[in-house]
């Protein structure tokens, strides 16, 4: 059985509730090798859908890079972000999101 708990909960409290649990942190802040399951992890060479020959460092860079806003089009520079930081493109900066472009 798989249970999902808030990242904000302490490990100790999760283990009290589920004593036999194996805790798998797959966020971009994970401390072990499971960090590789985070959409922010820069594996590199991930094909951008519907974009012949275009690749990105991570899944989140594709998602954010293809996002279109009222005040901004796609951001292909995002595809090269390998820092796991500054990947989010926000409403505050770019306006209302209109959706995602089908490729570049």
Regions of interest found by a model, annotated:
Residues 1-104:
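Charged, low-complexity intrinsically disordered segments
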């Amino acid at each position: 059985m798989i249970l999902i708990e808030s990242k904000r909960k302490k490990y100790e409290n999760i283990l009290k509730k589920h004593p036999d649990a194996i805790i798998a942190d797959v966020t971009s802040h994970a401390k072990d090798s499971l960090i590789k399951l985070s959409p922010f992890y820069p594996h590199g060479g991930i094909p951008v859908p519907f974009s012949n020959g275009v690749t990105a460092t991570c899944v989140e860079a594709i998602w954010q890079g293809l996002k279109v806003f009222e005040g901004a089009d796609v951001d292909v520079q995002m595809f090269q972000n390998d820092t796991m930081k500054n990947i989010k493109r926000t409403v505050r900066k770019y306006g209302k999101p209109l959706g995602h472009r089908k490729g570049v």
